[in-house]
Amino acid sequence: MAGELISFGIQNLWNLLSQECELFQGVEDQVTELKRDLNLLSSFLKDADAKKHTSAVVKNCVEEIKEIIYDGEDTIETFVLEQNLGKTSGIKKSIRRLACIIPDRRRYALGIGGLSNRISKVIRDMQSFGVQQAIVDGGYKQPQGDKQREMRPRFSKDDDSDFVGLEANVKKLVGYLVDEANVQVVSITGMGGLGKTTLAKQVFNHEDVKHQFDGLSWVCVSQDFTRMNVWQKILRDLKPKEEEKKIMEMTQDTLQGELIRLLETSKSLIVLDDIWEKEDWELIKPIFPPTKGWKVLLTSRNESVAMRRNTSYINFKPECLTTEDSWTLFQRIALPMKDAAEFKIDEEKEELGKLMIKHCGGLPLAIRVLGGMLAEKYTSHDWRRLSENIGSHLVGGRTNFNDDNNNTCNYVLSLSFEELPSYLKHCFLYLAHFPDDYEINVKNLSYYWAAEGIFQPRHYDGEIIRDVGDVYIEELVRRNMVISERDVKTSRFETCHLHDMMREVCLLKAKEENFLQITSSRTSTGNSLSIVTSRRLVYQYPITLDVEKDINDPKLRSLVVVANTYMFWGGWSWMLLGSSFIRLELLRVLDIHRAKLKGGKLASSIGQLIHLRYLNLKHAEVTHIPYSLGNLKLLIYLNLVILVSGSTLVPNVLKEMQQLRYLALPKDMGRKTKLELSNLVKLETLKNFSTKNCSLEDLRGMVRLRTLTIELRKETSLETLAASIGGLKYLESLTITDLGSEMRTKEAGIVFDFVYLKTLTLKLYMPRLSKEQHFPSHLTTLYLQHCRLEEDPMPILEKLHQLKELELRRKSFSGKEMVCSSGGFPQLQKLSIKGLEEWEDWKVEESSMPVLHTLDIRDCRKLKQLPDEHLPSHLTSISLFFCCLEEDPMPTLERLVHLKELQLLFRSFSGRIMVCAGSGFPQLHKLKLSELDGLEEWIVEDGSMPQLHTLEIRRCPKLKKLPNGFPQLQNLELNELEEWEEWIVEDGSMPLLHTLRIWNCPKLKQLPDGLRFIYSLKNLTVPKRWKKRLSKGGEDYYKVQHIPSVEFY
C-alpha cells in the first residue's frame, strides 16, 4: 500500500520538475539527474512495499523515501516560487526582506543534488537487502491499476440496496417501543458491521414510531463523548429550534433539570447510537425520570452496556445474514441489474462471488464493501485475483485489529482500502482528521484535498474543485467506504461520514503510513497516531494552541483545528498564542477558525507561509489583516468571515492571489477599504462582495463563479449589476442584497438568465416582472424579500417546474391577491409567506402544488381567510402566525387528511367561535392554539381529531370552556386562560392522558371531578394555591391520589 502512496508523491514531484524549462535555468543538470533518479526509484517500490513487513531495514527505507519526496516537493516548489517572485515587478520591501526571495541558484543546485544522493543511497540499501527492480520504460508512469480503475464507468448507488433480511427485525423492535408499555430500554448489540445503526435508523423513521412519540432524538455517542454534549443534543432535538442558543448556555445541572421535566411530561424516544462502555450509559442515564413516558433505543458492540435483570430492559441481538440474504445483498451492489428479466450472471463470477461472501460471515458491512470493490472489476480474472487475495489475508492471519470477532470483517474492509487507486487512498486517509460521528462538510473537504495536491492533474485541470470533490466522494460512496447522500435541492454531496468500523480502518492505515498526528483536548495525553513527527497535525477541540511552543516540526504541511457543530452554537472559541509563523513556512493548509488572537491582529509573519494554499479564519476574532498576506500567491481557499463587532481592516492585497478558487470576505470592512479583485478570474465561490469596497466591473472576468453573494449600495445601478454578472453563466447559487433598492423606482429589473442556477435569493426593489424577465428553469430554491412586486408573482413562479422551496419574505409582494393555478408548482414541497402587509386574498386552484407538505404563513395581517377549496391535500404541517383570519379556518383545514401538525398562533384567527366537525383532522397529532385574543368558544364534535396526542392552548383570554373527547390525547397544556372558569371532564374522556399542566388560569377554582377516572395520568402540574386541597387529607385529594407525580408552581 505504501508503494502506491509513494508513487503518488513521486508523480506530484515529477509534475513539478516538468514545468517550463526556463524556470530551472542554472540548475538544469541537477533537475535532469533528479528526474532520472526518481524514475529509477519508482522501479523498486513494488518489491520494497511487499518486503517492508518482513524487514525493518526495508521498512526504514520506505519511510526515508517518503521524506525524500516531501523534501523534494518543498525544495522544488520553493525554487519555482522564488523564480516567479523574482520576475514580478514592484515587489514590496517587506517581501524583499524575506530571506528566501532572492534565489541562490548554487544553494538550490546543492539541495537538488543532495536529493539525488539520498535517492542513490536508499536504492543501494534496498538492493543490499534483496529488493528487486522492476523494468520501467521511459519517463515516470502512473500505476496501471490506477488507470484501469479510473477508466471504468460509474454506477449510481441503489439507496435501498442495504436493506436486506432486516424486515422481521424492524417489526420486532417497533413492537417493543410501541406496543409494550413496560419496556423502557431496548439495546441492539452485536459485533461491528452487523448493521445495528442501519436497523436503528429504520426503526427511528418508522411511521408507527413517529406517531407514538411526541419527540424524537438521535445522538451519536462514540468513544470520546461528554455527558454535557449528549444532554445538550437531546434537549435541542426535543425543543423548538429557537431555544438552541439558550440550551447551549445552560449549566449541566440546569440541563439535567430541564430534561427530567420534559421527559416526565411528554412521550419521547431517545436513540443513543454506538455506546462503548457500561459506564457511558451510567453517565447519560440520570436524565431519565422514573415515570414511563420515555423510551431509549441504543446500539453497542458491548452486550453488557444496558443489561438489567428486569423486564423493562430488552437486549436484541440481530443475527448475521443467511447465505441467501448475503448473496442477494452482494448481487444488488456488485452486479446491479438493468433488466432483471434478461440478466444472467457469469457462472465463474457466481462461483467466485459465493466463495468470497463466505469470508464475510454474514456481516452486511463487509458484504457491501466487498460488493463495492467487485462492482469496479469487470473480468473474471479480476474477481479471481481478489478472491485469492482475501484467502491469503485470512490464511496469513496478519492484522492489527484487537477484536478477534471482527477479524473477518476487518480483513475485507482493509482490502477495500488496498484496492483503491492511489489518489483515493489519500482522499480516504484524509478523513482521519475528523472525530467519530463527525458530519464532514464535503465542500471544505474538497478544498483540503486540492490544497494538499491530492487531486490528479487530469481531473483537476480546468475543473471546478467542488465538482472534482463530488466525483471522489461518489467513488468512495459507491465502494461503501463513505456514507453520504446527495442533497435534494443542490444535487450535491453536502456532508459525509464514516461507519465506525471503516473509521477504525482509516485510523489504522493513517497510523501505518504516519499520515497525520491527532491531538485532542478531551484526552489527558493527546491521541497521537504516531510517535514519529508527521507532516500533518490536527487539533480536536483545542482550548489554547501556541504556534511557537506546541509545534516543533518545521516541515509541517498541514495544521487543522476541528470541532463539532454544536460547539459553534455554544459560542465555542479557543486561544491562539504565539505571534510568529516563521517556523511553519512549509505549511500548505492552515485552518484556525474560531481562534481568538491577541489584540485581534493576525501576525505579519503569516506572509512567510508562501506555500500556503488553504487559510481559514472563519469566525476568528481578527480586526486587522496584514499587508504581508499578499505574499500568499498560491492560496486557493481564503475565508475571512471574521467574528468581530466592528469592521475588519483588509489591505488591497487580495489581487495578488490569482490562484484563489474560494474567497469569503468580511461582512464589514469599513468604507475606507477598497479592494481590486479583477485578477481573481479562477474564483468559483465569492461571498460578501460589497460595492462599498469593491467594483462590480471586477466580476466580469470571473466566469468560473458557481456561488456569488453580493451587496449593492445606493450609488450602484441595476443596469451596471446586470452587465457585470450577465456573463457568469455557470452560477449555481446567487444572492443579491440591495441596500439602496427603494431609490431605484425608475430602474428596469434584471433578467436572471443563468441556466445552471439552482438557488436564488433576492433582497432588492423589483416592482415588476416583465414577460422578458424570467427566472432560470432549473431553480430549486427561491427566496424573495423587499421586492415590493406590484403584480401577482405566482403566474411566473409556478412555471418553475423544478422549484422545491419558495419563501416570499417581508415586503416581497405589495399587491392584494395571489392565485396559484391548476398544475402550477408541480415539485414545490415547502412554501413560506412572511410579512406581506397588503395581501388580502389567496386563491388556490385544483391540482396546484400537488406535493406541498409544509406551509408557513406569518405576519400577513390583511389575509382574512384561507382558500375555501383546493389547499394541497398532502400538507402535513401548517403554521399560521398573525394572519387575522376572520372566518373559522377549521372547516377548510380539517379536510386535509394527511395533516399531522397545526399551529394557530398570535391573532391568526380573530373570530369568536371555532368548530371542528366530526371525522375532521383524521391524522392530526399536534395542535397548538396561542394568543387568539377573540376566541370565546371552541366546539369539537365527536369523532374529530381521533389521533391527536398533544394539545397546547396558551393566552386565549376569552376562552371560557374546553371541549371533551380526544381519545388519543397524551399531553395537555393550558396556560393563561383568563376567563376559563369551569372544566367538566366526562367519563371516558382523554383515556390515555399522560401529562397535564395548568398555568396561570386565575378563574379556574378546582380540578374536574372526572380527572380521578383518568388512570393513565402520570404527571400533573397545577397552581400552588391548590396545594392544600390537593394534598393528602385535602378535600380534592381523591381526584389526584392515583397520579405518581404532582407538582405545584
Swiss-Prot record:
Keywords: ATP-binding, Coiled coil, Leucine-rich repeat, Nucleotide-binding, Plant defense, Repeat. The LRR repeats probably act as specificity determinant of pathogen recognition. Residues 139-158 are annotated as: Disordered. Residues 25-41 form a coiled coil. CDD domains: RX-CC_like. GO terms for molecular function: ADP binding; ATP binding. This is Probable disease resistance protein RF9. Belongs to the disease resistance NB-LRR family. GO terms for biological process: defense response to other organism. InterPro entries: Apaf_helical, LRR_dom_sf, LRR_R13L4/SHOC2-like, NB-ARC, P-loop_NTPase, RX-like_CC, Rx_N, WH-like_DNA-bd_sf. ATP binds at residues 190-197. Residues 144-158 have a biased composition (Basic and acidic residues). LRR repeats lie at residues 584-608, 609-634, 657-682, 683-707, 776-799, 800-827, 849-873, 896-923, 945-968, 990-1015. Residues 147-460 form the NB-ARC domain. Potential disease resistance protein. Pfam families: LRR_14, NB-ARC, Rx_N, WH_DRP. PANTHER family: PLANT BROAD-SPECTRUM MILDEW RESISTANCE PROTEIN RPW8 (PTHR36766), TIR-NBS TYPE DISEASE RESISTANCE PROTEIN-RELATED (PTHR36766:SF30).
